[in-house]
Each structure stands twice: as C-alpha cells, then as structure tokens.
Amino acid sequence: MSNQRDPRYDILFEPVKIGPVTAPNRFYQVPHCNGMGRMFPDSMIEMRGMKAEGGWGIVTTEQCDFHPTGDVQPFTETSMWDDGDLPYLAAMVDAVHEHGSLAGIELVHNGQDSGCLYSREVPIGPEHRPVTWHQHPIQARAMSLDDIRDYRRWHRKAVLRARQAGFDMVVVYAGHNGTVPSHFLSRQSNQRSDEYGGSLENRLRLYRELIEETRDAIGDTMAVVARFAVDEMMGKDGLEWAGEGKEAIEMLAELPDMWDVNVSDWDNDSMTSRFAREGYQEEYISFVKSVTSKPVSAVGRYTSPDTMVSAIRRGVVDIIGAARPSIADPFLPNKIKQGRSEDIRECIGCNICAAWNNLSAPSRCTQNPTMGEEWRKRWHPEKIAAKESDSTILIVGAGPAGLEAALGLGKRGYQVTLAEARNEAGGRVTRESRLPKLNEWARVRDYRLGQIQRMPHVEIYLESEMNAEQIREFGADKVALATGALWRNDGVGRNIRFPVPGCMALTPDDIMDGKRPATAGSAVTIYDDDHYYMASVIAELLASEGYRVTLATQGMCVASWAEYTLEQHHIENRLLNAGIQILARHQLTEVGEGWLQLTNTLTGEVSNHEGSVVSVTARLPRDELF
C-alpha cells in the first residue's frame, strides 16, 4: 500500500480563494440533509466535524430554515429562527474549524412547499396555491410587496446571526424547486404581473436582491455562495440550462463569491446509481465556468479521484462538490492525499441516506455503518477499539454482514476465519449487483474484500459449507452466523398473512440463480408486496429477455417505498417505457397451472391472468445452524 500521493492528484489539494476566505483544498461537502439537525444537534455536530477531520475543505450545514413561515416539520433540519439557535450552530462551526476547514451555512425558506405544521403560520409563496409537500390540505398565500420586503429582512437577520455563530460562508439557495427564490424563478410557480413576475429578469429579482443584501450585510467577513439549479428537467416547461438557466447565470455572474450549481428537483439532483452515472450533471452545468470568473462547484456523486481531476482539468468545475460520497466515506479526501485511494469507501448510490432523512430519522449509509452514530455510540469510520482477548473467531457466511463483521474484527486484531458455502463472496450483494443497473452495489463487497485481503490474520474459505458438527469441530472460541435469508415462494408478506392457495412461485433467488418461467416469451406476473426495488428490477430483467411482464402490487403505485429514495417515478417511467403493465391495488389470491388470480383490494373485483408468477414478498432467515 502506497503512502505517497499520486502527483496527478496534487491539483485536488490546491487552496482555492473564495472571496474573502480560502478553502484549504478543492473538496466541498455541499449542504445535505441528515435527519439530525435541531432535534439531535450533538449527532449533527459530531457528524459534520468528522467530515472536516476526514479532509473536506468546506463543510456546510443542511438547509437551515430561518423563519417560522418556512417551518418544515416533520423534516428534521437546522433552524435559525432566533438567537436561541446560535449555540448549537456555533458548536458545529467549532467542530469544523478544529480541523482547519471552512464552515458554511445554507439559509433556506421553503415557502409554498412547507405546511408550517409546528409553527402554525400561514405558508407564503409567489402565488396563492396549495402547499406541495405531502399534499397537506393547507394553502400558501401570495406574498405582497410588503411580504417580500419582510422576507428579505428575515434573510438579512439570519445572515448576521450566521456571522455571529462564526460561519465562514453563507449559501444563498435557489435550487431543487424547494425554496422561495426558486419558486419565484420558476414559471411553473410564478405567474405574477408585478416587478417580481413575468420576464426572467423580474423572476430573478428576489434572488439578486438576496445575494446583494447578503454581501452588504457581511462585507468581506464571509464568502457568499450562490447555490443555483440551472435546469428544472421539465424541458421547455421549465428552466433549461441552454436557455433561461444560462441567462440567469450570466445576469448574476460576478455577484457571488462562488457558484454551486446543480439541477432540480432533488430526485433529479440526487439520482440513484440505477439511473445516473458518476458526473452525470456535467452536461447541464459545464457552461457555467465560461460565463463567470468566480469558482464553480457542482455535484455528481464523484468517488473516483481520476474523474475529479478530469472535471477540474477540463474546465467543468474548480471545486468538487459532494454529499453522498462524503457520507459513504468522510475520509475520502485524506485517503487520496495520503496515497490510499484504494481504501476509499465508494458511495453505491442507493440513497438510503436520503430515505432515512425523508423518514425524519437520522441518516444511515449502506457503505458506512458509522454514519449517524458518531456521537451517540462514538463510532468512528476509520478507528475501532483494539481486541480485548486472544479469542479466535469463526464467521459462517461471507455476505455483506459476514464481510462487515470480518472487517471490523480484523481491524481490531482478532484471528478470523470466514467460511462461505458459495464459490464467491458477497452473498446477496454479489447476486443483486448482476441485476439491471445495480452493478455499483458490488462496491459494498469490493471495499470489504479489498480491506480483508490485506489482513494476514483474516482468512476466507469459499465453497466451504459448514454444518453444526463441523462448526463445533473447528474449535473457534467465538462463532458468528451470517447465513442470510431466502425469499418466500408462497405469497406471504406484508399484506398476505397465510400462503396463497396453489402458490409455489419463482422467487428473486430463483431468478438470480438462472431459473426462468418455462416458456420463453410467455406471460409472467410479478407480485410485489416488498414495495422497494426488487420487483421492478426483476420486471426489467424479464422484459429485456422477451417475457410479457405484468407487475401487480397492493401498493397505490409501483415501488412505493422508493419515494423515500427519490426514485419511484424514475422506476415507474422505466417500467412503462419497457412495456411492462402495472396493476396497483391488486392482491394475489390464487395460483393454478399456467394461471393466477388477482383481486382488486378496493372493489373486490377478481381477474384471472395467464402465465406464471414471481413472488417478491418477504424473506425467511436461513436458520438451520441456530
């Protein structure tokens, strides 16, 4: 393992001047929600400090709402409604400064998106319209000119409080179609006829005023960052990067100290790896550097230092922005700096981090189990307590749980033996990563195997199925069983509590093992009571092989839980484009030879369908050894 940085990466560690402040390198942890915020401030503070310890030159808050009319309950964000919020925000600044990084704050008012469920204030926005989040039966009122002046005053007060808390940078946010400035900018939400509506110049007026007034309030004591979505991804119905998006940047080009550019809305900006590759936003934002002299940052789930360097050298960005990669590996910058790129814990793009935030819970990460537990459990992504004994340990099963256990115990110094029945490690991760567009999920396996293979005291044995007697004979002091689970084939799941008559369906395990419905090109119904990704990827696979696929689910839509991972509508669009029929609110009630019966859960109407069944419902643990 090299301890010398590849000189190709030196450019990533050059300081960057951003107005009156200087970032120590080109790594910018952009604002990202995390489900901690004001409800769990100690957890939030420790998590942000960990990013700074790991080498991120700029570390920012999540969105920080600055007035009760922008209350975002039930989401857990930071807030700056009054001076009472200063202590925990100042503590975050101290945690970031301790490691020499710049601390930034993103001031946000969600306007017509937020229902003000806690504050009970009337939401505000450019127009009279219902609030958008959760379809609450709450109406936002159109802002008068006096309201706009009040809003600007509230924002200025928040900027001054941010300076009082010690922040180095303030982010003025007009992105994700989720803030008052972005609502004024969008033709979809602003059809005013006064000086704040109509032309692009008018719709951009409020954002210009906020940037100018932020600069006036803080002078040269803090940097001003414009976080701006250049494309609403609506085609000609919205802002487009080659049209008004570019014109807006040109109008404001030299006003901020830095541009942080992206696309709207959040589920386009943070697309999963199933739908977007690393650096996918470059086609939308690459023009920005040509129209401003100020530093430009953008995101794109960058995990490869080669891709980062390329983006800088090609003149796409000056600063690498990242949210999810900084969650998966808070020490990504330091690993590159120390010549340890092979140790990077690469983001797999599953968006479980976003899901937990959307569930109003502290974020977690598939790759980084310490995320969200830096304070409560004192977990550190790179440090772990040394072993407490000389016990030998046998782990049965080299799936993701077995690999993680072996890695953690190996780091502690234990002698570990890992036995796997199959001819390859990784378990479900290996198998699922071969399904359509899930290849990056294999990073869960690859990172752990890469670390373990450099540990002489951790041994892996493949094709080594063990029974209880063999485990006893092995003689390890401690045994951990990580033998996983198998999908049920009888239809039992969340909504069906007893086996479906006649159901001996194929399962995802069968499909991943190469089994198929008997006749190529025949009809197959995938019954989904899991409501996440699996049924849809099985549907994609079988449709690509020529089967006539129907996806039936008791949910109100396909892959309903994927709303939390920001990909439900992407999934549904892909299935429809593949010619897959979707039947929502349908329950599997009987299966026969070459046919199945579905019942509409609202009307009770029964329909018979030809073909075979794939059941994606629930799993049972492989507990033979317990």
Question: In which residue ranges do the predicted regions lie?
Answer:
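Hydrophobic, well-ordered secondary-structure elements that form the walls
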Residues: W259, V288, A311, A323, ...
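Rossmann-like dinucleotide/flavin-binding elements
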Residues: K387-L418, Y461-R472, T483-F498, G502-E563, ...
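A conserved short coil-to-beta-strand element within the FAD-binding core of flavoproteins
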Residues: Y461-F474, A584-W595
